[in-house]
């Protein structure tokens, strides 16, 4: 009986030599999710099959026209049916969180402009972001499975086709936005932020950071561009806190207009509320966090205004839906960051007012109320954002738990225990930040009531690749 030898998924091509390790250097170089379960094929050249001969003239034609670089890219095109399935999933689950185009508009693009490079790669990137957010995969009729990571890598390897320094800016911007969502879900913070900067750079080059650029556009075009602008604004402000880079987008651009819809899956209410949550603090707030310093425009009164205005969410939002979860944790996160800035400005004298000292406990209690009422499956859709935001609240609380008087300290410790249980139950991408939290608890002589070890995200990068 012949013993079957196995090889890397990437290296099973006959002419590629594999060093026998799993994954090999080529798998790592191309960020390929290797299973090492492919039958090893004989090395050496392989005669061209009859079915392959017909692709040679097509490949030459595409190369001569500079619209395609290799015949392989023709053969790797994602089937329409797979993209359409992703578009339906996006419509049903994710449009309320990051609204770009409705299913009808996306399906029309798929039918009419599938062969347009800019449109095609946007639809592939949207499919990748959708599968990444929902942590799922789809299988084509040929039995090949598509995951968000695979589609994102395919997009990045074909980047010259949709970003050739010309063409349709809006599709390039949306493509980069979708790709940054894919990389944020795989905990690749550096590349996710890099893609965010690519999209913002295109926004600025196209003049979309100036309101007058929208005046000559139709209402539909304005709506789409305003949605994209504010999606990037929210993303940039989130990353500014952890990448420590000041923001470039501000609220001089008007948000999109409300739309009358009968389908709740197309409602923009959650998106409008998220815009409110991230714009109430103002640009100076996030820049102060990025530079770890406070400016004259970021005063104690303006920070206290954040606590008050973000205390509750809009009544228009359906409680404990996909949209509500992200809004809820973002409110608690920003209020905790504002509390830390006030504490940084005033030092220990801040605790002379008992009400000030109790604000952080109230923030943590509000977060616990939402935690107890939220189904667990809703957290995963938002990827690393929920663990990071909840960990920020827990970090702030442990910093000051020993500064309370005896009665308040006991309450704060009990709340910290409940918050830490939730934090430890999530998948985390930032190991360093989590270890600092554990060290702080030990230094404060607090024993965390955790019975199981820290659960890291399976896709987490090495510590050197993670923004601390």
Curated annotation (Swiss-Prot):
Location(s), subcellular: Nucleus
Signal peptide start and end residues: none
Zinc listed as a keyword: yes
GO biological process, one term: regulation of DNA-templated transcription
Parts forming coiled coils: none
DNA-binding region as annotated in the record: 8-34
InterPro entries noted in UniProt: Carb_Metab_Trans_Reg, Maltose_ferment_reg_DNA-bd, Transcription_factor_dom_fun, Zn2-C6_fun-type_DNA-bd_sf, Zn2Cys6_DnaBD
Keywords recorded for this protein, A-Z: Activator, DNA-binding, Maltose metabolism, Metal-binding, Nucleus, Transcription, Transcription regulation, Zinc
Main subcellular location: nucleus
GO CC annotations, alphabetized: nucleus
Motif (Nuclear localization signal): 41-49
GO molecular-function term, one example from the UniProt record: zinc ion binding
UniProt family annotation: Belongs to the MAL13 family.
Role played: Regulates the coordinate transcription of structural MAL3S (maltase) and MAL3T (maltose permease) genes.
Protein name (Swiss-Prot/TrEMBL): Maltose fermentation regulatory protein MAL33
């Amino acid at each position: 009986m012949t013993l079957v030898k196995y090889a890397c998924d990437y290296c099973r091509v006959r002419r590629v030599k594999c060093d026998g390790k799993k994954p090999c250097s080529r798998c790592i170089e191309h960020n390929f999710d290797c299973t090492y379960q492919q039958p090893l094929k004989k090395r050496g050249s392989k005669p061209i099959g009859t079915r392959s001969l017909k692709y040679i003239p097509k490949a030459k034609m595409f190369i001569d026209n500079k619209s395609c670089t290799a015949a392989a890219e023709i053969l790797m095109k994602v089937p329409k049916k797979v993209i359409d399935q992703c578009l339906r999933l996006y419509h049903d689950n994710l449009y309320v969180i990051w609204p770009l185009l409705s299913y009808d508009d996306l399906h029309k693009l798929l039918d009419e402009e599938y062969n347009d490079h800019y449109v095609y790669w946007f639809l592939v990137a949207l499919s990748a972001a959708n599968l990444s957010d929902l942590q799922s995969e789809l299988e084509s009729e040929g039995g090949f499975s598509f995951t968000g990571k695979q589609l994102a890598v395919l997009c990045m390897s074909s980047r010259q086709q949709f970003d050739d320094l010309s063409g349709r800016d809006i599709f390039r911007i949306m493509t980069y936005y979708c790709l940054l969502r894919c990389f944020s879900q795989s905990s690749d913070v550096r590349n996710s932020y890099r893609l965010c900067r690519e999209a913002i750079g295109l926004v600025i080059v196209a003049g979309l950071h100036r309101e007058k650029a929208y005046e000559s556009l139709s209402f539909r075009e304005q709506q789409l561009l305003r949605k994209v602008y504010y999606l990037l604004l929210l993303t940039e402000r989130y990353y500014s806190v952890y990448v420590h880079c000041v923001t470039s987008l501000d609220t001089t651009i008007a948000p999109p207009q409300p739309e009358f819809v009968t389908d709740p899956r197309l409602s923009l209410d959650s998106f409008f509320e998220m815009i409110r949550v991230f714009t109430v603090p103002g640009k100076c707030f996030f820049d102060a966090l990025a530079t770890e310093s406070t400016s004259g425009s970021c005063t104690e009164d303006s920070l206290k205004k954040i606590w008050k205005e973000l205390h509750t969410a809009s009544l228009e939002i359906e409680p404990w839906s996909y949209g509500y979860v992200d809004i809820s944790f973002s409110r608690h996160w920003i209020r905790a960051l504002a509390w830390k800035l006030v504490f940084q400005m005033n030092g220990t004298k801040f605790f002379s007012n008992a009400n000030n000292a109790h604000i952080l406990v109230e923030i943590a209690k509000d977060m616990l109320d939402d935690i107890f009422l939220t189904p667990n499956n809703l957290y995963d859709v938002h990827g690393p954002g929920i663990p990071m935001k909840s960990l920020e609240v827990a970090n702030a609380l442990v910093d000051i738990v020993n500064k309370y008087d005896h009665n308040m300290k006991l309450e704060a410790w009990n709340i910290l225990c409940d918050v830490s249980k939730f934090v430890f139950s999530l998948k985390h991408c930032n190991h360093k930040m989590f270890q600092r939290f554990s060290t702080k608890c030990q230094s404060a002589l607090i024993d965390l009531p955790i019975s199981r070890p820290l659960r890291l995200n399976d896709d987490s990068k090495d510590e050197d690749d993670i923004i601390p």
